[in-house]
Amino acid sequence: MTGWVDRLRRGWQRRQFRNSEWRFLFDAPPPGEWVALDCETTGLNTRTDEIIAIGAVRIVGQRILTSERLELLVRPEGDVPAESIRVHRLRAQDVQAGVSTEEAMRQL
């Protein structure tokens, strides 16, 4: 029963999404495939803090495809607070050579 509900929800979400470049994100995923995603941020406030690192790895069935992993440093617009450095060990000088947020989303 949830199959048709999921398809209906994805269709509605796709129509609501104005930027057609990203509409594929609402397509049904391939069966048995997943992506494990990890993000490091400058803090926990979704309105003010930024992503500064993204890691992703593809999983197919029971296999983790480490050869298809993605590791990105993302250049923040603001500062990297000392509190977040203690958590993920990424300093401002580590992420300054990173890609822009927009480029990171495209690569992801």
PLM region descriptions:
Residues 4, 11-108:
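Conserved non-catalytic scaffold segment of RNase H-like nuclease domains
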